[in-house]
Structure formats: structure tokens, C-alpha cells
């Protein structure tokens, strides 16, 4: 019996591979536990179409992330925060603050987990922060932190 693996099966193969197995093993174990489907032409064609659709979606996402990285490289994000008498900020600027400011000022949505803050931003000045967008794509974001008196 030929089966198309839908999940990785130790000792047999990876998802998407077609293998010849004994009838009982294929029907009772692999198909019964949802690890494989009986490899008919319809199932194989459906699997290939699904893989093609996933690859196209992945390529679109990669292109979108590259465009976001280009936008971030050309953006200087301006954040105004309250400062005390000694010139330091009340509290630190967090990843959530950066994500919200980027969305509000530039309309670019970036997950707060993507920002790499090596040290907390607790004073005014210009900072460069690395943004890891996923799929190995990184961008540098300039942040201009200005203070406003209380």
C-alpha cells in the first residue's frame, strides 16, 4: 500500500513523502493516527497544490517583510517623553511604546517582540535599534527621543 505522509514519522520519512508500507501498518497505524493518507492521485494532487500555495504565501510574506525593512531603514521615529529636572526620562521607553509609536506615526505594524533593545532607553537622544522581522530579515530603526518638561 502506498501512503502519503502528512507528518514526520520516525524511521519512515518526512511529511510529503510517498512510501510503500504493509497494508496493516498503513491502514491501522499511519492512517488511523492521522500520520498519513492513502496515496491516491487525488490526494497527491491536493498535497502538491497545498505545497504550491504555501510556497507562494511564503514568498509574498518574504517580499512584504523586505518592503517593511526598507521602510524602517528610511524612518526616524520621534518619541516625546516627560523628563525630570536632571534630564532623564520618567520611566524607560519600552518595546510596546516603540511598536505603538511606529503604528501611530508611520502606519507600519511591527510586533513588539521584534525590537532588540540592548539597554533600556532612559534618556533623550538619538538611538539606533535593530528590528528582527523574521525569516532572517533585519532592519535598523532610528529613534529620536525628545524630552518635554513636566
From Swiss-Prot:
The keyword Ribonucleoprotein applies. SUPFAM superfamilies: L9 N-domain-like (SSF55658), Ribosomal protein L9 C-domain (SSF55653). GO terms for cellular component: ribonucleoprotein complex; ribosome. InterPro entries: Ribosomal_bL9 (IPR000244), Ribosomal_bL9/RNase_H1_N (IPR009027), Ribosomal_bL9_bac/chp (IPR020594), Ribosomal_bL9_C (IPR020069), Ribosomal_bL9_C_sf (IPR036791), Ribosomal_bL9_N (IPR020070), Ribosomal_bL9_N_sf (IPR036935). It holds the Pfam family Ribosomal_L9_N. Binds to the 23S rRNA. This is Large ribosomal subunit protein bL9.
Amino acid at each position: 500500500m502506498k501512503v502519503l505522509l502528512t507528518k514526520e514519522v520516525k524511521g519512515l520519512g518526512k511529511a510529503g513523502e510517498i512510501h510503500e508500507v504493509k497494508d496493516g501498518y498503513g491502514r491501522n497505524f499511519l492512517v488511523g493516527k492521522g500520520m498519513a493518507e492513502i496515496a491516491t492521485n487525488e490526494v497527491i494532487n491536493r498535497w502538491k497544490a497545498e505545497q504550491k500555495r504555501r510556497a507562494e504565501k511564503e514568498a509574498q510574506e518574504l517580499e512584504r517583510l523586505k518592503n517593511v525593512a526598507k521602510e524602517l531603514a528610511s524612518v526616524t521615529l520621534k518619541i516625546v517623553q516627560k523628563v525630570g529636572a536632571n534630564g532623564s526620562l520618567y520611566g524607560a521607553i519600552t518595546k510596546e511604546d516603540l511598536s505603538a509609536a511606529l503604528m501611530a506615526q508611520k502606519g507600519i505594524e511591527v510586533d513588539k517582540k521584534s525590537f532588540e533593545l540592548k539597554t533600556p532607553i532612559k534618556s533623550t537622544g538619538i538611538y539606533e535599534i535593530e528590528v528582527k522581522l523574521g525569516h532572517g530579515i533585519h532592519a535598523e530603526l532610528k529613534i529620536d527621543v525628545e524630552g518635554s518638561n513636566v
